[in-house]
From Swiss-Prot:
<dbReference type="InterPro" id="IPR020809">
    <property type="entry name" value="Enolase_CS"/>
</dbReference>
<dbReference type="Pfam" id="PF03952">
    <property type="entry name" value="Enolase_N"/>
</dbReference>
<comment type="function">
    <text>Catalyzes the reversible conversion of 2-phosphoglycerate (2-PG) into phosphoenolpyruvate (PEP). It is essential for the degradation of carbohydrates via glycolysis.</text>
</comment>
<feature type="binding site">
    <location>
        <position position="335"/>
    </location>
    <ligand>
        <name>(2R)-2-phosphoglycerate</name>
    </ligand>
</feature>
<dbReference type="InterPro" id="IPR029017">
    <property type="entry name" value="Enolase-like_N"/>
</dbReference>
<dbReference type="InterPro" id="IPR000941">
    <property type="entry name" value="Enolase"/>
</dbReference>
<dbReference type="GO" id="GO:0000015">
    <property type="term" value="C:phosphopyruvate hydratase complex"/>
</dbReference>
<feature type="binding site">
    <location>
        <position position="163"/>
    </location>
    <ligand>
        <name>(2R)-2-phosphoglycerate</name>
    </ligand>
</feature>
<dbReference type="InterPro" id="IPR020810">
    <property type="entry name" value="Enolase_C"/>
</dbReference>
<keyword id="KW-0479">Metal-binding</keyword>
<keyword id="KW-0456">Lyase</keyword>
<feature type="binding site">
    <location>
        <position position="283"/>
    </location>
    <ligand>
        <name>Mg(2+)</name>
    </ligand>
</feature>
<dbReference type="GO" id="GO:0009986">
    <property type="term" value="C:cell surface"/>
</dbReference>
<dbReference type="InterPro" id="IPR020811">
    <property type="entry name" value="Enolase_N"/>
</dbReference>
<dbReference type="Pfam" id="PF00113">
    <property type="entry name" value="Enolase_C"/>
</dbReference>
<feature type="binding site">
    <location>
        <position position="386"/>
    </location>
    <ligand>
        <name>(2R)-2-phosphoglycerate</name>
    </ligand>
</feature>
<keyword id="KW-0324">Glycolysis</keyword>
Length: 426
């Protein structure tokens, strides 16, 4: 079996024009694995730490040359000569090399880039798709896309406090047909916004960022767009929100839509929304530091709607385990760079599934052309993916890769559609 011959890191750019880490792992056979690490705008306090240079003379302090040096130095030295096929063993070496809880010594960006590149190199050497390498022959389920078509919060410069308004196409019996429904709705949304005199500029994730007056106005416009596209809201296409409420939570109070609100008032707000609109999923409805609020909303709405912990769990199995024990949330957003290795990410997904929590594989707002998460979604049979809107190549790349995977799987491909949310009555 071929061994690792070369590990090489370099500084490249993400979709926001910020530096990020790319890693190449080459095997003795010539097989090559390459990976680029994404970065987030609204980040959880407990996320693994991406290492930035802090030199104001380069990229406004956001350079990643230190992380790149770590790849080319200490990491390369540790991995060259090893076989790449035991992902867990490789990742454990990386974790021990770093030696910190949050991967702050070498940088989660250096560690994750290497972890992903090793997996790709091994898959390429074996001549199998990455999803098959990660998930074996059991990876065959194509995910429902949660498409962020209206941006607010930290992802846009407008009045909307909710960070993402998503359409969730569940129709058609195949990923390609659900994607088509989402894309057609996106184009009709653009027409409606133009007719109403709103901007159709797009935000970080390819969604529109109009200066709407309220969350309800955004949801009303989405309902119109779905109908204009010829689909039925609540049947063909559902809705989802990423509130990212940690962004406006301070001293026990939510400063939301011009008012200071308690946890109880926020929960009442969500209750009204899910009665009025076909909302199937709400991400980070409560702050990552408001565990009592999370317990209450899970008790009240947990059988009606998917309650997703992102900032709450930061893809960390230890924190997820605590959430499960305390009855907090019923789903987890999974982001590779929140935890920092492929193995730990797979562990988190496995734990979620064992305890009947949904797992949604997710991009970051600062993305790249890398399509690793498309393969991860299929490998884990996660059933849901968040990878932005129907514009910007960094988002479309993931959808196109899923189309290729669906084609490759042929009759073996499965798309659950509405059944992904069978547990919820909203």
């Amino acid at each position: 079996m071929s061994r690792i011959k070369r590990v090489h890191g370099r500084e490249v750019l993400d979709s926001r024009g910020n530096p990020t880490v790319e890693v190449e792992v080459e095997l003795e056979s010539g097989a090559l694995g390459r990976a680029i690490v994404p970065s987030g705008a609204s980040t959880g306090e407990r996320e693994a730490l991406e290492l930035r240079d802090g030199d104001p003379k380069r990229y406004l302090g956001k350079g990643v040359l230190k992380a790149v040096d770590n790849v080319n130095g200490v990491i390369a030295k540790a991995l060259v000569g090893l076989e790449p096929y035991n992902q867990r063993e490789i990742d454990q070496i990386l974790i021990e090399l770093d030696g910190t809880e949050n991967k702050s010594k070498l940088g989660a960006n250096a560690i994750l880039g290497t972890s992903m590149a090793v997996a790709r190199a091994a898959a390429n050497e074996l001549g199998i798709p990455l999803y098959e390498y990660l998930g074996g022959k059991f990876g065959y389920r194509l995910p429902v896309p949660l498409m962020n078509v209206i941006n607010g919060g930290a992802h846009a410069d407008n009045n909307l406090d909710i960070q993402e308004f998503m359409i969730v196409p569940v129709c058609g019996g195949a990923f390609r047909e659900a994607l088509r429904a989402g894309v057609e709705t996106f184009h009709h949304l653009k027409k409606i916004l133009k007719e109403k005199g709103y901007s159709t500029n797009v935000g970080d994730e390819g969604g529109f960022a109009p200066n709407l007056n309220s969350s309800e106005e955004a949801l009303d416009i989405l309902m119109q767009a779905i109908e204009k596209a010829g689909y039925k809201p609540g049947e063909d296409i559902l809705l989802a929100l990423d509130v990212a409420s940690s962004e406006f939570y301070e001293n026990g109070v939510y400063k939301f839509e011009g008012k200071e609100r308690s946890a109880e008032e926020m929960i009442e707000f969500y209750e009204k929304l899910i009665q009025k609109y076909p909302i199937i999923s709400i991400e980070d409805p409560m702050s990552e530091n408001d565990w009592e609020g999370w317990k209450e909303i899970t008790k009240r709405l947990g059988d009606k709607v998917q309650l997703v912990g992102d900032d709450l769990f930061t893809t960390n199995p230890k924190i997820l385990r605590k959430g499960i024990e305390e009855g907090v949330a019923n789903a987890i957003l999974v982001k590779l760079n929140q935890i920092g290795t492929v193995s730990e990410t797979l562990d988190t997904v496995m734990l979620a599934k064992e305890r009947n929590y949904s797992a949604i594989i997710s991009h970051r707002s600062g993305e790249t052309e890398d399509t690793f998460i498309s393969h991860l979604a299929v490998a884990t049979n996660a059933g849901q993916i968040k990878t932005g809107s129907a514009s910007r190549t960094d988002r479309i790349a993931k959808y196109n890769e899923l189309l290729r995977i669906e084609e490759r799987l042929g009759n073996g491909a499965v798309f659950w559609g509405r059944e992904e949310f069978y547990r919820f009555t909203s």
